[in-house]
From Swiss-Prot:
Intrachain disulfide bonds: none
Subcellular localization(s) per the UniProt record: Cytoplasm
Protein name: Exodeoxyribonuclease 7 large subunit
Keywords annotated in UniProt: Cytoplasm, Exonuclease, Hydrolase, Nuclease
Gene behind this protein: xseA
């Protein structure tokens, strides 16, 4: 009979403990074996047995993972499977739950690929910070590939169609086999050292993991990472990945896409050039228009500030002053002309118009502003002296000082002497503010 102090387990508890031990004690494992008892129910899950000559293990691959298998699982097929050990508690079945499975021919290569990829990742060879940007305009391109493969035909066809001016050097190489990796590495290093190329393209068409294995070589990966020239990798189809893709500066899913990435479409380029030319013409016209407007404004300012312009302005002012002065003088002369013949003769002899003409002629001969200003001041002083002289001889000025001009009303003749009048004669005396009629009472000479 069992010791009451010992723990008594139920089947569920025991299976749960066993499951925990299996899942905790075994990490992710790889198993290479032969498929047997393959079934796929309506759920889409895949159930089978992996076996060798002496043992077997039940396996399950659930629908989200089995959908992505690249082959059709069948009886007797040798595979490489990856999964975790577990226990199906309801029946106590020990089994392997898989998340990846491939045909066994690629199994060893896949493990080597994963190990090398993890090591190079840890070294930072795949870091985005170390990758170089492609130049905006590629002028010389080196293409490392098989000269007889479909990849080179696709690349050259796209390049010729999109940008025929590109200079392309084909560096022929093996792209699969034992010596392919060394040959590709050597060509890459020589092309990079030459400094001739803007970009180096490494490419080939699709194939199995074994066919593409040259592009998973560690020496090639390190050569790509060390290259000073930007490197583009386009190996296989879109779903294929190689170490050269991860370490290259740019990865293209196919050779054709790589060619499209490297060069612009010449039709698009021509359109861009035309748009740029139109924009440049527009900017030039705008700049020219602005420059002409600025030039016109400067020319106007220069003309306005030039000595000649200043002289013309002063000349116009002088002419205006002369016209005003002449108008005033003519008004006075017109009133006195009929009455004072001699005064009119004196006024005509001192007519300011002749003096103004002389002054204007001298002003036009003066260009520098300072000299013109001095001459203008001198002429203004002279005009004032002439005006004072005219006022001194003007009959009106004499009358304004308290004198009178005496004339005969009958004929307007001026009485110049007391001897010319007789007692009782009626005369007219012209005063400053009007005239009066007078009669001679007596006279003395």
């Amino acid at each position: 009979m069992a010791d009451r102090n010992e723990q008594i387990l139920t089947p569920s508890q025991l299976n749960s403990l066993a499951r925990d031990l299996l899942e905790g004690g075994f990490p992710l494992v790889w198993v290479e074996a032969e498929l047997s008892s393959v079934t796929r129910p309506a759920s889409g899950h895949l159930y089978f047995t992996l076996k060798d000559a002496r043992a077997q293990i039940r396996c399950a691959m659930f629908k989200p993972k089995s959908t992505w298998l690249k082959f059709q699982p069948r009886e007797g097929l040798r595979v490489l499977a990856r999964g975790r050990l577990t226990l199906y508690e309801a029946r106590g079945d020990y089994q392997l739950v898989l998340d990846h499975m491939e045909e066994a021919g690629e199994g060893a290569l896949r493990r080597a690929f994963d190990e090398l990829r993890a090591r190079l990742t840890a070294e930072g060879l795949f870091d985005a910070e170390r990758k170089q940007a492609l130049p905006a305009h590629v002028r010389r391109l080196a293409v490392i590939t098989s000269p007889s493969g479909a990849a080179v035909r696709d690349v050259l066809s796209v390049l010729a169609r999109r940008f025929p001016l590109l200079e392309v050097d084909l560096l022929p190489s093996l792209v699969q086999g034992d010596s392919a990796a060394a040959q590709i590495t050597s060509l890459l290093q020589r092309a990079d050292a030459s400094g001739r190329y803007d970009v180096i393209l490494i490419t080939r068409g699709g194939g199995s993991l074994e066919d593409l294995w040259a592009f998973n070589d560690e020496r090639l990966a390190r050569a790509i990472a060390a290259a000073q020239t930007p490197v583009v990798s386009a190996v296989g189809h879109e779903t294929d990945f190689s170490l050269s893709d991860f370490v290259a500066d740019v990865r293209a899913p196919t050779p054709s896409v790589a060619a499209e990435l490297l060069v612009p479409d010449q039709r698009e380029l021509v359109a861009r050039v035309r748009r740029a030319q139109a924009r440049m013409t527009q900017l030039q016209q705008h700049a020219l228009g602005n420059a002409m407007q600025r030039a016109d404004r400067l020319a106007l300012r220069l003309r306005a500030q030039s000595p000649q312009a200043r002289l013309q302005l002063l000349h116009r002012r002088q002419e205006d002053a002369g016209r005003q002065l002449r108008a005033r003088m003519m008004h006075v002369l017109e009133r006195l002309q009929a009455r004072v013949q001699r005064g009119q003769a004196q006024l005509q002899s001192h007519n300011p118009q002749r003096h103004l003409a002389g002054l204007q002629q001298r002003l036009r001969a003066l260009h520098p502003q300072a000299a013109m200003q001095r001459r203008l001041q001198h002429d203004q002083l002279q005009l004032r002296r002439i005006a004072r002289s005219l006022e001194a001889v003007s009959p009106l000025a004499t009358v304004a000082r308290g004198y009178a001009i005496v004339t005969r009303p009958a004929n307007g003749s001026v009485v110049r002497s007391a001897a010319e009048v007789v007692t009782g004669e009626r005369l007219r005396a012209q005063l400053a503010d009007g005239s009066i009629e007078v009669r001679v009472e007596s006279g003395e000479s």
